[in-house]
A protein has these predicted regions:
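N-proximal low-complexity "stem/linker" segments adjacent to membrane-targeting elements
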Residues: 1-29
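A conserved acidic beta->alpha catalytic loop
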Residues: 26, 43-51, 68
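Glycine-rich, basic loop-to-helix element that forms the pyrophosphate-binding segment
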Residues: 65-83, 93, 104
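Short aromatic/hydrophobic "clamp" motif used to bind/position activated sugar donors
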Residues: 88
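Conserved donor NDP-sugar-binding/catalytic core segment of glycosyltransferases
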Residues: 96-134
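Short, flexible, basic/aromatic active-site loop/helix in glycosyltransferases
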Residues: 137-176
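A short, conserved alpha-helix in the catalytic core of glycosyltransferases
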Residues: 169-196, 200-230
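Active-site-adjacent helix/loop segment of glycosyltransferases
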Residues: 212-302
Length: 304
């Protein structure tokens, strides 16, 4: 009789062979005897040595190969077809976890059946906390104050700091709106209730969408800083300076992800907020997204 799977880990990878190896080594150290862990790596049409490395060095991994880059949502949904665990951990290939992380996250979720998803404190390899592990939902006001830079000036303000909610105590566990797809620990029955990742998002925004649906369904989303993950932010997309040298994201992929980051804002707003705000606010928000997109693509084109 096969053992019950406690946690199914899905790691999505596209041309991150160096980081993927480090991620899997850290996961191996976290595969403690008291937990039965299923590990699934979904390769999103990599052209580097990622597939060969997984097959040769990590035979305990279930490898799923996609001939096409399905994006973040599509790739994770492909991995979900193999899931057997009571819990699911969506883990980026550019993340390394602490040896005790999985045990602690499961224990935390076990203590409260109303928690649908949680995320730990995520720190950047270059230093400091990754703010995206602790977010409010991107309402028009939260987004406006964030993009105008008011959150940086007044990070503890409940009016100007809604985007990352840094007015809350970051050293103790508490409920939040949205965590981070980089390390997203979800109860399997929660995901069955709310549905899989929305594949209209290619890259960016899909994690906030999923957290939003989890909250809508009445589950709690928790920030749990008593365990830690380390993040090479931007390595998967190749959009950030610190990703250079550790990823081989092509110019085509980087342009596609830059466009997707803007499209995600529009998809999310139309899906969840269009009916909540009047037509004038909606017109202003959508126009703002278009303008933001033009500036982002201009900045991208000037970097080459």
């Amino acid at each position: 009789m096969s053992k019950k799977v406690d946690i199914s880990v899905i790691i999505l990878s596209h041309n991150t062979e160096i980081l993927l190896r480090a991620c899997l080594i850290s996961l191996l150290k976290a595969r403690r005897g008291e937990l039965h862990i299923q590990t699934i790596v979904v390769d999103n049409a990599s052209t580097d040595r990622s597939i060969q490395i997984v097959k040769k060095e990590f035979p305990w991994v279930e490898l799923v190969e996609s001939r096409k880059n399905l994006g973040y949502s599509g790739g994770n949904n492909l991995g979900l077809k193999k899931v057997k665990g009571e819990y699911i951990l969506f883990l980026n290939s550019d993340v390394e976890i602490k040896p005790i992380a999985l045990v602690r996250m499961k224990q935390f979720m076990d203590r409260d059946a109303k928690i649908g998803a949680s995320t730990p404190k995520v720190e950047l390899f270059r230093g400091g906390m990754d703010p995206d592990c602790h977010r409010g939902f991107p309402t028009p006001l939260a987004s406006l104050t964030y993009f105008l830079g008011l959150e940086k000036v007044f990070p503890k303000s409940r009016i100007f700091g809604q985007y990352h909610q840094f007015y809350l105590d970051l050293e103790i566990p508490h409920e939040i709106d949205s965590g981070f797809g980089t390390f997203m620990f979800v109860r399997s029955k929660t995901l069955k209730m709310v549905g899989n990742w929305d594949e209209r998002y290619f890259f960016y925004g899909e994690d906030i969408d999923l957290f939003y649906r989890i909250k809508q369904a009445g589950w709690k989303v928790m920030y749990y800083p008593e365990t830690l993950a380390l993040h090479h932010k931007g390595a998967s997309s190749g959009l950030r300076k610190e990703s250079q040298g550790v990823t081989v994201a092509s110019k085509e992929i980087r342009l596609k992800t830059a466009k997707a980051s803007i499209e995600a804002m529009e998809i999310f707003y139309k899906k969840f907020y269009k009916g909540k705000y009047n037509s004038l606010i909606t017109m202003i928000v959508l126009a703002g997204i278009k303008i933001k997109g033009l500036f982002r693509l201009l900045k991208f084109s000037l970097s080459f």
